[in-house]
């Protein structure tokens, strides 16, 4: 009886007493191995899924960014034949920044012209040059490059465009002193010029030009409107005040050309600012593009009349489109 009274019935042992029956080491070994691999697998799965989602959104964003830039920037490459020598050139239209950039040549012969239509400033610089040149131009707003614009410009791709220099063409000569306060210049032009000193360009004509220009202005001053259709083309002087002819000092004696819409006076509502033609931005009477080169020269002291007032001329060339195309596509006015 004494031996039986010392025994504890199994039914008297509660659930809390089971913990004390198990060794501590055994409990530790069974808990840790079962939880650690599962947690690592979950973290790895979350990282992989997050990375895949980020890559997907990045690809979508890059696609739309590229697609958006394609509507704002368009490049075309062509070749110019200057005095029998071929040179590579390119034109870039950046509608987002309202810029038009022309490049000619490469290496030490490279010339770059940037037209800032937002602020009405043109910047020109040459490779290896010690100056950056600016001149005023018309202000405009470049629309997005549409499919029609691309098709029109793509006709220049791969073509060899001859360059014709006119002996009595306008010459741009830098002023003596650089610009001291450049706060009026946009960040685009300042970035384009970099650390180079900036000089204004002033137009100058060769020796025989001033007298002819004065005669042209006198002959065209009484009438600033377009010439009537019945009037012969050879009777009116090609002055700058005429809105139907190119500002040139040469005699305008072209025969009637039925293929030229300006000879037929089609589209009476389409008139152009002569400054567009005079500054080489577009050609009023042209139906096809051509290459326009302008001479950028350094001032030379001494006697004023030509050729003693400038030296060291270099050429900067660009494509000039017909004004009908330029106004419709670039200015977006038509």
From Swiss-Prot:
GO BP annotations listed: cartilage development; endothelial cell morphogenesis; negative regulation of angiogenesis; negative regulation of endothelial cell proliferation; negative regulation of vascular endothelial growth factor receptor signaling pathway
A Pfam family annotated for this UniProt entry: BRICHOS
Intrachain S-S bonds: 132-193, 282-286, 283-323, 293-317, 297-313
GO cellular component: endomembrane system; extracellular region; membrane
Keyword Glycoprotein annotated: yes
Propeptide: 211-214
Coiled-coil regions listed in the entry: none
Domain BRICHOS per the UniProt entry, residue ranges: 105-201
Signal peptide as annotated in the record: none
PANTHER family: CHONDROMODULIN-RELATED, LEUKOCYTE CELL-DERIVED CHEMOTAXIN 1
Listed name of the protein: Leukocyte cell-derived chemotaxin 1
Classification of source organism: Eukaryota, Metazoa, Chordata, Craniata, Vertebrata
């Amino acid at each position: 009886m004494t031996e039986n009274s010392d025994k504890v019935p199994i039914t008297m042992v509660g659930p809390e007493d089971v913990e004390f029956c198990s060794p501590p080491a055994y409990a530790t070994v069974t808990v840790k191995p079962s939880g650690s691999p599962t947690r690592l697998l979950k973290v790895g799965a979350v990282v992989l899924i997050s990375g895949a989602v980020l890559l997907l959104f990045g690809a979508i964003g890059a696609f739309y960014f590229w697609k958006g830039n394609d509507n704002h920037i368009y490049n075309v490459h062509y070749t110019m034949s200057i005095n029998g020598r071929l040179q590579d050139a390119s034109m870039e239209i950046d509608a987002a920044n309202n810029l038009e950039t022309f490049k000619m040549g490469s290496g030490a012969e490279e010339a770059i012209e940037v037209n800032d239509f937002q602020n009405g400033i043109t910047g020109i610089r040459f490779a290896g040059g010690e100056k950056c040149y600016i001149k005023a131009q018309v202000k405009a707003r470049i629309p997005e490059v549409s499919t029609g614009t691309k098709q029109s410009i793509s006709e220049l791709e791969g073509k060899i465009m001859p360059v014709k220099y006119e002996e009595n063409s306008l010459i741009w000569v830098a002023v003596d002193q650089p610009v001291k306060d450049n706060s009026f210049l946009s960040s685009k032009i300042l970035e384009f010029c970099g650390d180079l000193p900036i000089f204004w360009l002033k137009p100058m004509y060769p020796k025989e030009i001033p007298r002819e220009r004065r005669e042209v202005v006198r002959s065209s001053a009484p009438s600033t409107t377009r010439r009537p259709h019945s009037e012969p083309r050879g009777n009116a002087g090609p002055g700058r005040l005429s809105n139907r002819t190119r500002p040139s000092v040469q005699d305008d004696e072209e025969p009637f050309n039925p293929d030229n819409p300006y000879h037929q006076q089609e589209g009476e509502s389409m008139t152009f600012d002569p400054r567009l033609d005079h500054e080489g931005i577009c050609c009023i009477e042209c139906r096809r593009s051509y290459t326009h080169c302008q001479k950028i020269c350094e001032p030379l002291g001494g006697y004023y009349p030509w050729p003693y007032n400038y030296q060291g001329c270099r050429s900067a060339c660009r494509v000039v489109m017909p004004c009908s195309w330029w106004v419709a596509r670039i200015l977006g006015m038509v």
